[in-house]
Amino acid sequence: MRAVVLRNGKVTVRETTDPVPGQGDLLLKTLSTAICASDVHYMDHPDLAINDPTGRSLYDPDRDIVMGHEFVGEVIGHGPGCSDAFPVGTRVTSMPIRLVDGGAGGLRIIGQHPEAQGSFGELLVVPEATAKAVDGAVSDDAIAVVDAFAVGEFYVRSSNMQPGEIPIIIGAGAVGLSAVAALTARGIDPIIVSDFHAERRELARSGFGAHILVDPAQQSVFDVFRQVRAERHLAGCAVVFECVGASGLIDKIVAEAEFCSRIYCAGGWYTGDTLSITEATRNGLTMQFGGGPMPQDWYGVLDSVVAGTLDPLPSVGRIIGLDEVPEALDQARRSEGPPRIVIHPNGDL
């Protein structure tokens, strides 16, 4: 098959070995797949995957790795032991994991392990155990970005926001927008969004329901928080969703955050970063790194997208073919372009 292949630190579009469905696997024709910032992190920080003690990810420079973990596909084949739940022609998606020995041996992240090849190719293998059929008229591209929106759902659910608390979203990329969408679905008001890019700030409001937009080059988001809290006579703390992952940002938030803020670090891999425990202690902060999305978040968001109660498509700004992926990955590395770029590996643009 043709695919975007990572090998020895280089990304090329070429032929690679077709995936073969194993016991209980479905073989899919990839219909739509999205680029995520974690694809770039995986490429740029291979040492983290070479030395991943969990075994969930692995970077091997001497093996072809097909990245991509946000996808939807059409069933075109079955491995041994599959049921009849997903006939040929069924449109399916899945959480991006492959179970090892039915889960007894852990799991692999699809698109971040040579034994769990990803969706930046014409074909893809997923476990029947995690697959879910996609019915209805919802577009392939909307399904392809479910994973990103499940991230925001997970962090917002984990935050357990209380009356009087004010959410602050730092970064209006796909994950930041997903957090805005999850807050909006819960009727939270006000929602403060901070991003350097005016277009992304406006998308957070027009596409997903944010109320107050902040340009961090012009003013501190925490100054805005204090002003809003005073104007609305709210007594709750700040609940911060950090959705950027830039080096040094967490430490800056820790230093500037209001007393007793809760901080949810959704931005990704904080490679080599440090933070001041002294400042965090003085400010009485609660912090969470990673941990999701969980299946209830992922499949719950999928159900919402299929039902039409969540429309993630405003986050999609480009649809490309495989040949354009290397350039698009570089664009994502620079935090340029739309929040989500979607790929149609089989050419239906």
In which residue ranges do the predicted regions lie?
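NAD(P)H dinucleotide-binding glycine-rich loop of Rossmann-like/cofactor-binding domains
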Residues: 57-64, 69, 96-170
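Mid-domain Rossmann-like dinucleotide-binding core that forms the NAD(H)/NADP(H) cofactor-binding site
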Residues: 136-218
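C-terminal hydrophobic helical "lid"/dimerization subdomain
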Residues: 227, 251-255, 295-349
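Short SAM/SAH-binding signature in class I
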Residues: 237-241
